From Swiss-Prot:
Keywords: Hydrolase, Metal-binding, Zinc. Completely inhibited by Cu(2+) and Ag(+). Partially inhibited by Cr(2+), Pb(2+) and Fe(2+). Mg(2+), Ca(2+), Mn(2+), Co(2+), Ni(2+), Zn(2+) and Cd(2+) have no effect on activity. The chelating agents EDTA, 2,2'bipyridine and o-phenanthroline have no effect on enzyme activity. Stable below 37 degrees Celsius, activity decreases sharply after incubation for 2 hours at 45 degrees Celsius. Binds 2 Zn(2+) ions per subunit. Optimum pH is 8.0 with 3-oxo-C8-HSL as substrate. Activity increases with increase in pH from 6.0 to 8.0, and declines slightly at pH 9.0. Little or no activity at pH 5.0 or below. This is N-acyl homoserine lactonase. The keyword Membrane does not apply. Its EC number is 3.1.1.81. Zn(2+) 1 binds at residues 104, 106, 169, 191. It is an enzyme of class 3 (hydrolase). InterPro entries: AHLLactAiiA, MBL_superfamily_lactonases, Metallo-B-lactamas, RibonucZ/Hydroxyglut_hydro. Disulfide bonds: none annotated.
Amino acid sequence: MTVKKLYFVPAGRCMLDHSSVNSTLTPGELLDLPVWCYLLETEEGPILVDTGMPESAVNNEGLFNGTFVEGQVLPKMTEEDRIVNILKRVGYEPEDLLYIISSHLHFDHAGGNGAFINTPIIVQRAEYEAAQHSEEYLKECILPNLNYKIIEGDYEVVPGVQLLHTPGHTPGHQSLLIETEKSGPVLLTIDASYTKENFENEVPFAGFDSELALSSIKRLKEVVMKEKPIVFFGHDIEQERGCKVFPEYI
């Protein structure tokens, strides 16, 4: 079975210090990076990968003032970038979705999770537990009483949608290998690799455990050798320029 359509859905932008994308650089220059959600249309129903930024980031570039990342992370989010508004533009309401897949629980990937009261939210146990106790996770990204589906390790969500446990950027990060009708296999590294440079040249970037992150990149390289997928990175400005976005699909 394959995924009928894979949509790239823009979900705002984020200014991030370039040293977060390349740890060998001296902090002080901000990059304007894309924030993505991904919509999968499958035989079983629609699946959303990541939910963008939280409502607290709307028109609030100073969201992280007074924190350890002040001046290094500046969200650029409008009302239109709220996940409920994004879904409306693509023809869905929150209750229509079969699953939410949280690649990890950082603010630009899980900020909209609270819009999904009943929809199962698939997240790695290591990520769920880390988010309970670390200041780098916003409360909007780890709300209680949501319908969390806790998994451990690799996991097939539906036929054609495989989660790959790729820790390092965070303790429980997961990437996706998707078999699409139109384009064949597609690998979404998400934040296991921000950019092509991180992936191909193994340039270090921001994360919880740099050695673990490198191990995950090496693992994904093995997947690429075996499956020959199209590879999309988490926040690659160069790749964004040629990316097909909704209503186009791959």
